[in-house]
Amino acid sequence: MNSLYNHGIKQTQLITKDLSSFEKSLSTSPLSLQGSITTSLTAFKKTIREYNDLVAQNKKDESNAKHEARLAKFNQDLQDFTSKFDSLKKQRDQALQETNKQELLGRRHTTQRQQYGENPYDTGPTQQQQQQQMSYQEGLYKEKTSLARGTQQLDHILDMGQQAFEDIVEQNETLRRLQSKFEDGLVTLGVSQGTIRTIEKRAKQDKWLFWAAFVFTLVCFWYILKIFR
């Protein structure tokens, strides 16, 4: 249990470091940093589940109270990390939208100066020209907004993929434990080894189907990411 606890401590340190880097460079941080944080949070959740199982199995241990306190601290850390990560992502989206808006306004003023500042007899843009310029700027702004929404959707897809991966791993571990218990039960009931081997062979085939479906899922997500990028 101590080794698993130490592993969890290292994970909290890594997540804290990545969140700090993300906070310092919200608008310039790469998407890969967000992916790294999401992966670290998923791994930390798995560590907490495993640590919780060990604590439940050793309730009669004298040091169980200490481990329960550590488990509570891990759960609180996970909640704080998740809340801060969600908040930082929202701040990043708002900062990018504001930056895009300011860039569009700056381009608009620069274009107007270039078009009308060189002619001293020009009194300024006509109403039609202003409308055309506004339409152009609005089009650019809508394009930037669409790209920002696409980025948000991409983040959402990454989160969904990470959650699906976590669920698949958890289900695989559950099936493995059930298979072990099932085999022990068959031996207790006196089922022949040949029958057990047949069942294991069938289970292995199902496992290959499982991993094939998993690889297919990864390929689908890769194509989705490629389309969005």
Curated annotation (Swiss-Prot):
Highest classification ranks of the organism: Eukaryota, Fungi, Dikarya, Ascomycota, Saccharomycotina
Function recorded in the entry: SNARE required for protein transport between the ER and the Golgi complex.
Organism: Debaryomyces hansenii (strain ATCC 36239 / CBS 767 / BCRC 21394 / JCM 1990 / NBRC 0083 / IGC 2968) (Yeast)
Gene this protein is translated from: BOS1
Name recorded for this polypeptide: Protein transport protein BOS1
Positions of region (Disordered): 89-135
Ion transport recorded as keyword: no
Topology, Vesicular side: 229
One of the Pfam families matching this protein, by short name: V-SNARE_C
Sample GO molecular function, one term: SNARE binding
InterPro entries: GOSR2/Membrin/Bos1
Biased composition (Basic and acidic residues): 89-106
Residue spans, topological domain Cytoplasmic: 1-207
Cell compartments where the protein resides: Golgi apparatus membrane; Endoplasmic reticulum membrane
Keyword flag Protein transport: yes
Superkingdom classification of source: Eukaryota
Segments crossing the lipid bilayer: 208-228
